[in-house]
Amino acid sequence: MKTRRGKRPERFWPSIVMNKWLNRKPKVYDFSEDEIDTEPESEDDVCSVKDVPNVHCVTDEDSHNGRRGSEADHGNNISDGGVSVRGGYQRKHRRGKSETLRAQYINTKDIKVTVATWNVAGKRPSDDLEIEDWLSTDNPSDIYIIGFQEVVPLNAGNVFGAEDRGPIPKWESIIRRTLNKSNKESVYDQSPSCNNNALHRSHSAPSSPILAQEANSIISHVMVENLVADHSLDLATNEFIDAATALPSLEPQRNPNMDWPELALDSNPQIVGSEGKLRRVFSSNATLGFKLPENPSGASRFASEARQLKRSRSFETLNLSWNDIKEEIDNRSSSSSEAEEAAKIMHDDSSDGDSSSQDEEDGDKIRNSYGLPEDLVEECRKVKDSQKYVRIVSKQMVGIYVSVWIRRRLRRHVNNLKVSPVGVGLMGYMGNKGSVSISMTLYQSRMCFVCSHLTSGHKDGAEQRRNADVYEIIRRTRFASVLDTDQPRTIPCHDQVFWFGDLNYRLNMSDGEVRKLVSQKRWDELKNSDQLIRELRRGHVFDGWREGPIKFPPTYKYEFDSDRYAGENLREPEKKRAPAWCDRILWLGKGIRQECYKRSEIRMSDHRPVTSIFNVGVEVFDHRKLQRALHVNNAAASAVHPEPSF
């Protein structure tokens, strides 16, 4: 189901200009996203939770003495952005905890992440632009982080005034069409989740581009709302509510795929009482496990009753329990003779014949009992299933634009989305140069994505200005903390960080030598003169960061709509720029493994787009491990302090 959020009011143009000129910063930066549209749980949604009494759920940070003091010290350390006196920055330890204790209840799940960056030189995309190779849709990922530089021309109107947002919807439409074009199913792969022996499905980007006619789209949208809201019909899993089966026995069936609501590591610990059991949460499309009777008249009544049950998203307030369901249906069915007859019929039917075949026949009858044409139901199901990727955040600052897309089934596991734009351009704070950073929590791992456009220039010493931009971005980037709104969080405080964009680092080599080595594809000799690689080796900037091996030609500077580097034709009146690897992708943190680092041959701009694919190990809370650890601790405590006997 979709949850519509209130529409943000349009910002007044003069206020935008004044805020830019006066360098006024809001407390919280807004961003755009798709409407919330959750998907039913599957075997990919780990971990499951069972009702367990006597559980006191705490984080390992709480187990250390002096936790508050250590966090206060940590806040003081990062209050200046982690910048040392010498001008560099020092990476701080975000957690002070025992990894041994942490391993007792945390699992690791591999998530495939694609990071893509492209300086489009202010060019608007054509309607038929193909970016499949750039986004590597043949090797689909779980998360796509797509960054642009110069998405609008860097003229005075966009820099000093309200930037043009016209190209953004067009780029988003192309990205959405590309990611949701294919509908292939890849093979099952092994995923280190809660159950290492379980096979988890790895979906590729879905098929058939969304080119349906407007009338079909409207019909499908209306059908989705009616089926989900009025009949509690789950289009994704073909499961239906059956209230009659629930009448004889209302005890909940154990579903191992029920997910544990994620809790960010910086949030307050949740205390679960020892007497009451853990309450389960249903996703917006999850079914209640009931069955409708064979009689359509009885089915309509039970469907109307089931509609009264309130649903909840897994990461929101736990407001639905089986006791509430049981009490509600008991009250409604106690005075209903139809309910008793339907339950008796269902009980008699279930006693003979093949139960599995009977369920399939009942399912077909249920579909027809709603009076809906099967072709419309199928069309509605296809439209819903085709949207496998949704946009969870996008943000523009002048020419810098970053957009994050994620599989719809993973959206429920994303929390604490924050954005932080930092301008380091004209006057030291204008947005023609700078960065847009995104912070989010996926399961229990904090991730940060930094899309930047650094100072240009190929003269000697220009790399020092770029280094200064990096230090300034790290110092000024702030994310409001979930634990304490007054305590900022910085880029190095995350578990995994990805920095990408037009970093503008050049080659310390003459133009003629560069072009000669490029023509001979001698990349290793060129890399020895690369400014960024030298800085990484010396530790002057991006200390501790990593970059994959570069095995592709320099990405800058090309002639527009051509495969020829600019400056090769000496008779043309153009700036002479030696080829360079200006567009880069770096990463910092544990559990990151790079699979691919490449560029794509799209000739629209004077830059070539760059892509990197990663396998990222994110932390997932495992309730089973926590239960075992608590049992061991309780047993040890009982052995040391035995209960007195009377």
From Swiss-Prot:
Species in which this protein is naturally found: Arabidopsis thaliana (Mouse-ear cress)
Reaction catalysed by this enzyme: 1D-myo-inositol 1,4,5-trisphosphate + H2O = 1D-myo-inositol 1,4-bisphosphate + phosphate; 1D-myo-inositol 1,3,4,5-tetrakisphosphate + H2O = 1D-myo-inositol 1,3,4-trisphosphate + phosphate
BP term (GO), one: inositol trisphosphate metabolic process
SUPFAM superfamilies: DNase I-like (SSF56219)
Extent of Polar residues compositional bias: 188-207
Region (Catalytic 2): 575-590
Entry annotated with the keyword Hydrolase: yes
Bias-annotated ranges (Basic and acidic residues): 59-74, 341-350
Region spans: Disordered: 59-99, 185-207, 329-369
UniProt note: phenotype after gene disruption: No visible phenotype. Alterations in germination and in early seedling growth. Enhanced sensibility to abscisic acid (ABA) with elevated levels of Ins(1,4,5)P3.
Residue ranges of the region described as Catalytic 1: 495-510
Family: Belongs to the inositol polyphosphate 5-phosphatase family.
Tissues/organs with expression: Expressed ubiquitously.
EC identifiers of the protein: 3.1.3.56
Gene3D superfamilies assigned: Endonuclease/exonuclease/phosphatase
Protein function: Has phosphatase activity toward Ins(1,4,5)P3 and Ins(1,3,4,5)P4. Seems to be involved in the abscisic acid (ABA) signaling pathway. Could also be able to hydrolyze PtdIns(4,5)P2 and PtdIns(3,4,5)P3.
GO terms for MF: inositol-1,3,4,5-tetrakisphosphate 5-phosphatase activity; inositol-1,4,5-trisphosphate 5-phosphatase activity; inositol-polyphosphate 5-phosphatase activity; phosphatidylinositol-3,4,5-trisphosphate 5-phosphatase activity; phosphatidylinositol-4,5-bisphosphate 5-phosphatase activity
Keywords: Abscisic acid signaling pathway, Hydrolase
Protein name: Type I inositol polyphosphate 5-phosphatase 2
Pfam family, one: Exo_endo_phos2
